Swiss-Prot record:
GO cellular component, one term: small-subunit processome
Compartments reported by the entry: Nucleus, Nucleolus
Function: Required for pre-18S rRNA processing. May bind microtubules.
Tree of life domain: Eukaryota
Protein name: Nucleolar protein 58
Amino acid sequence: MAFVLAETPAGYALLKASDKKIHKSSTLIEDLNTLEKVVDQFKVHRFEKFQSAANALEEVNAIIEGKVSENLKKLLEDSKADKKATLIVSEAKLGNAINKLGLNFQVVSDSASLDLHRAIKEYLPELLPGLDQSALNQMSLGLAHSIGRHKLKFSADKVDTMIIQAIALLDDLDKELNTYAMRCKEWYGWHFPELAKMITDSVAYARIILTMGVRSNASEVDLSEILPEEIEEQVKTAAEVSMGTEITENDLENIKALAEQIVDFAAYREQLSNYLSSRMKAIAPNLTAMVGDLVGARFIAHAGSLTSLAKAPASTIQILGAEKALFRALKTKHDTPKYGIIYHASLVGQASGKNKGRIARTLAAKAALSVRYDCFDEERDDSDSFGLDNRGKVESRLSKLEGRDMRTTSKVSRQQGKIDITEARAYNADADAPSAVADADSDDDDSETEEVEVKSDDKKEKKEKKEKKEKKEKKEKKEKKEKKEKKEKSDKKRKRDDDAEESSKLKKDKKSKKSKKD
């Protein structure tokens, strides 16, 4: 007896084959090319209908994962016979799982079984009564959409793909803006070259071109909305004595078109930056509190997803973005890099050169905790309290290393000694007596002698330290010299021994040759 398990969008169909050895005969499978032959060969033994669309999704996911669901197990247990029967399935993983159940089935899953399933699915509506092709197509489409949604696990609040695309677009916009601004300055510079030296902001430069047009209009237009009053006066003065060439209306139209592009791109870039900031606060608020929205977004984009970043250890997060330098260092056996993308975080930027590596390591450890909290804590709200607590710890660590409070711009240490303010003593007229003067002089002399003694003690200490250092250096030089002499002696001795061995060998060879001749 041979059964074929066919999974349909409507339910499980267990078909009984008229030929017991159909899976072994390639000719029989090849002959299943018409409806009559398929209907004659297979009959419906049992059909287990899915209860709902959600149930259908669960059953299909179980098949994909190679698991036997309760419905399928019940169907197979009800269908088992006294004699051992053959069960043909399409999925090898599912076949292994059915074998482990210990039912009275010999499970077969090979290339021939796939051809068999292909023939059955082609004429499935005719094999299953009450199921037409249109209904089957509708069920297949609905189930396919359900599987797609399940795999994507779509959530409007947890889509890190939006962050990845936004940060990539932001980088592209920056490059385009720089290119367009440079081209605009070079183009309009032929007409008004002095303007580029006075206006460094590209957007302000483009807005001036759109407002003013040719430089002769500078005295008539109002640029107070774009520039401060002082710079506006400088621009108008420079326009009157400019050394630039004249341009036509057609030239100006094209330059203005480029300037409009720059202004529009800048406005869109600002909007995109705000969008990215809001997305980061919704998806990874604690990571944003630690490293900022731009650096956090670059972390997620580089790792591929928020989950991948959360699974990464702190050491990986620390050097994320410096993979080329890392592998180059490993290849050449040099020092590995201390930081990657994390170098652009504000906390690392505040640290001095010698402390940057330490702060990068500390920040990476706390950022790893924050991103795991963002990713895996299901009960968390959108607050960034956990990230702010961690940031405070990193800031206190930075303050200890730098010796100053890094939360302020002041570079003066806050641990200064207290200043005692004492009242000035009133003048004592009795102190004018000669004895008092003498006593005062003697006190001054004593203080002077004490100062001299302190200075002499300092000199002695310095002298002793210097002598110790010189003795140590002499000792090291002597040891090096002795080692060198010993090495030279051993090398000479080894050379003499080698020469003696070679001479003895030569003598032996000569003797042996002489004895052979005799």
